[in-house]
């Protein structure tokens, strides 16, 4: 999957979210007799759905929509063709392609279409019958730097060809980042920079060493651009946003079987320097610009072909109803295909998600037999069967990914089947230490107790002459393992265990939760259950640089609320001193904060109020300027700041005397009601703090989005009367609308 980090910082265009979907690639094929380890994955741009039961009963007529994807009339420099091109039948399309279709009012929108109530939806080989779309949105062409902004080599200014200048600019724009300080990143960048420089005809200086390059002038230019962007007025930002939305609008949706569906990633990735995750060997390499000639479109037969940018033509046109991508191209870094597909909230993606979770749910009917069988196979006389059983055990019990072989130019991440000698340490009688880099180069480190026979098998798998670098499971691959699992259940693969165990664990955790407490308390309980799943799946994350500041802000907020509560209770005593005699426990916390602590709180509150007043003054003036009204003066602002300063003096006087005068119109009952409100806020904020600290190193979102059946979250929301908005973000509510609409509180995984 493409990483949003790969967006070039020197581009002012928006981030792109192109995904690389593995389901478009065939399963790796075995060499020879099937026992040899697969050394290289074979890629293909085409894959077919496994469901072949029924065909759609009716073909819906497609209303035609006017294609409005006129691309800016800016010249695009000559394309750089990737090393390999897709082996597909190409239909060249010139810039004068078919006219755009007329838009009709009869187009059915996807909104409100409940595909999960259609028994035939998603069945059969063909995923759609009619498909129209407007192609893809290309990033803006490169804008050369001003003549005074140059790369320097040994103190001399360098006149670079346009493409070489562009590549140098990508490095300069991120020169202060950790990536740019990585020696591997620097070397890969410099190698590609020299190659691009050679392609462009060279320059006036003989550049040979990275250490002699001075990017400071370029870096300063990009920093100035960033500062200018930050200092834009609200009106300017709004104008840019509207222009961007207008440009993107034609590409956001497509027409599939007469319904308008959202497109998930309609932008072509901009060029830049590849970053990658973890210790990726290709970090820093130049990700080249993608041109129309590199792109193949998938459309319905007879559908109007979107016109390519002027002077270009599409690489090919396909009419493949068995796949759901709209466009594809080969990316030069990983030499794999990237696909433009429908959005997460589309009907096609929804049915895919539902089938995934239903497949995992069906596993509960087979899991006991599978476990009984692999326990027997652990002692099988054939070594391959022992390895299959041992791998299945590890995948089932410890939620390991299946894993596959990686090339030398890929990050050294592993899963169960690709574990090597050095990744497993054995401690008799039955303890195993796993230590390896998993997906996204996240370290998997666990010391666990395993079945005695599993321990014995692992010891056998590590026997001499094996040593560091040798495969532990040298008789199996994920393909062999999955073929074995297919005997138990249609669609069962190693990764289904992960979804099953994540959802089963969530169900078990939810069964332990009592329906008590406030909404905030229930959300914390839900997150604790989610965290158990995330830990099982090893969904870690690095503690953010801002974590300590975020925790401090929440702690400060709690202290401010405690101070507010003390002030309110002192107001009660100002009205009726006998309250303290009648209920001394209620007033015990009056001395919880020292005068020094309260002074610090007051200064913080006052500074925030002043800052808010200045920001509001600026916002109001922006609005008045747009509406051509008289602007507020500095005197107006100063008047507000003076009032805030008076409040500050009053607060400090309260701290000094210990007396807080009740506000006009206050009563004991109204003040007690306010105290209760503040106490509830303290409780809720404390839960927020606990959540923040508990989940600082655990990523809850990954398991919630990909592994926990969303219907479990819906059940929790309905059963415990928690608004679904507290558990699912807007994105997840859209993605899992099918679960929200079709699940009641009695559903079980």
Swiss-Prot record:
Domain Topo IB-type catalytic residue range list: 345-749
MF-aspect GO terms? DNA binding; DNA topoisomerase type I (single strand cut, ATP-independent) activity
GO CC term, one of those recorded? nucleoplasm
Give one GO biological process term.
chromosome segregation
Q: Name the site position(s) for Interaction with DNA.
A: 277, 325, 356, 413, 439, 482, 539, 557
Catalytic residues as annotated in Swiss-Prot or TrEMBL: 707 (o-(3'-phospho-dna)-tyrosine intermediate)
Where, per UniProt, does this protein localize?
Answer: Nucleus, Nucleolus; Nucleus, Nucleoplasm
Task: Name the principal localization, coarsely classed.
Answer: nucleus
The record, for PANTHER family, names: DNA TOPOISOMERASE 1 (PTHR10290:SF3), DNA TOPOISOMERASE I (PTHR10290)
Regarding protein family, the annotation reads: Belongs to the type IB topoisomerase family.
Q: What is this protein called?
A: DNA topoisomerase 1
The major lineage groups are:
Eukaryota, Fungi, Dikarya, Ascomycota, Saccharomycotina
């Amino acid at each position: 999957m493409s990483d949003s980090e790969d967006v070039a910082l020197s581009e002012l265009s928006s981030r792109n979210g192109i995904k690389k979907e593995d389901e478009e690639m065939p399963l790796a094929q075995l060499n020879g007799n099937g026992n040899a380890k697969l050394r290289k994955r074979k890629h293909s741009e085409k894959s077919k759905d496994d469901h072949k039961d029924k065909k759609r009963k009716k073909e819906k007529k497609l209303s035609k929509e006017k294609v409005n994807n006129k691309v800016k009339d800016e010249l695009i420099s000559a394309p750089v063709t990737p090393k390999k091109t897709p082996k597909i039948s190409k239909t060249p399309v010139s810039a004068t392609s078919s006219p755009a279709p007329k838009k009709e009012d009869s187009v059915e929108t996807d909104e409100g279409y409940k595909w999960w109530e259609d028994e035939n939806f998603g069945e059969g080989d063909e995923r759609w019958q009619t498909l129209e779309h407007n192609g893809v949105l290309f990033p803006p062409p490169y804008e050369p730097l001003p003549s005074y902004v140059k790369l320097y080599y040994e103190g001399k200014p360098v006149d670079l060809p346009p493409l070489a200048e562009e590549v140098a600019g990508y490095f300069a724009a991120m020169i202060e980042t950790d990536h740019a300080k990585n020696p591997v990143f620097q070397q890969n960048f410099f190698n590609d920079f020299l190659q691009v420089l050679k392609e462009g005809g060279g320059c006036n200086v003989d550049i040979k060493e990275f250490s002699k390059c001075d990017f400071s002038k370029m870096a300063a230019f990009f920093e100035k651009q960033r500062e200018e962007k930050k200092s834009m007025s609200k009106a300017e930002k709004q104008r840019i946003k509207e222009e961007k939305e207008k440009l993107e609008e034609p590409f956001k949706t497509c027409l599939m079987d007469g319904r308008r569906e959202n497109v998930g990633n309609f932008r072509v990735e901009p060029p830049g320097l590849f970053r990658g995750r973890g210790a990726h060997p290709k970090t820093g390499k130049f990700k080249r610009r993608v041109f129309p000639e590199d792109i193949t479109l998938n459309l319905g037969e007879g559908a109007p072909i979107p016109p390519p940018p002027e002077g270009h033509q599409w690489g090919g046109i396909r009419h493949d109803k068995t796949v759901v991508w709209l466009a594809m191209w080969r990316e030069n870094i990983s030499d794999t295909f990237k696909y433009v597909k429908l959005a997460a909230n589309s009907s096609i993606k929804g049915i895919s998600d539902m089938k995934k979770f239903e497949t995992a749910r069906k596993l509960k009917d087979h899991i006991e037999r599978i476990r009984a069988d692999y326990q027997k196979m652990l002692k099988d006389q054939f070594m391959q069967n022992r390895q299959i059983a041992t791998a299945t055990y590890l995948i089932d019990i410890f939620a390991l990914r299946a894993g596959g072989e990686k090339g030398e130019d890929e990050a050294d991440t592993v899963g169960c089947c690709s574990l090597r000698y050095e990744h497993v340490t054995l401690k008799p009688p039955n303890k195993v230490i796993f230590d390896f880099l998993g997906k996204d180069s996240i370290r998997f480190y666990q010391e666990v107790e395993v079945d005695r026979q599993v321990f014995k098998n692992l010891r056998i798998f590590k026997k001499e002459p094996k040593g560091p670098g040798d495969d532990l499971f040298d008789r199996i691959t994920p393909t062999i393992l999955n073929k074995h699992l297919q005997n138990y259940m249609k669609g069962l693969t190693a990764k289904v265990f992960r979804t099953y165990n994540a959802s089963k664990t969530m169900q078990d955790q939810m069964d332990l939760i009592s329906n008590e407490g406030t909404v905030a308390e229930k959300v914390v309980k839900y997150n604790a259950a989610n965290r158990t799943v995330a830990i099982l799946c090893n969904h870690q994350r690095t503690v953010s640089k801002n974590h300590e500041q975020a925790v401090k802000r929440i702690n400060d907020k709690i202290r401010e609320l405690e101070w507010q509560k003390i002030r309110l209770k002192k107001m009660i005593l100002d009205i009726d001193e006998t309250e303290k005699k009648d209920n001394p426990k209620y007033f015990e916390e009056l001395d919880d904060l020292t005068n020094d602590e309260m002074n610090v709180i007051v200064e913080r509150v006052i500074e925030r109020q002043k800052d808010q007043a200045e920001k509001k003054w600026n916002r109001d003036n922006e609005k008045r300027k747009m509406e051509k009204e008289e602007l507020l003066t500095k005197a107006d602002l100063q008047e507000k700041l003076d009032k805030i300063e008076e409040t500050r003096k009053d607060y400090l006087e309260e701290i000094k005397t210990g007396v807080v005068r009740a506000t006009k119109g206050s009563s004991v009952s109204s003040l007690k009601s306010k105290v209760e409100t503040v106490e509830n806020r303290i409780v809720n904020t404390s839960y927020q703090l606990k959540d923040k600290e508990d989940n600082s190193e655990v990523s809850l979102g990954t398991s919630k989005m990909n592994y926990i059946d969303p219907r479990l979250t819906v059940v929790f929301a309905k059963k415990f009367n928690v608004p679904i908005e507290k558990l699912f973000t807007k994105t997840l509510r859209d993605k899992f609308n099918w679960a929200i609409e079709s699940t009641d509180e009695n559903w079980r995984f």
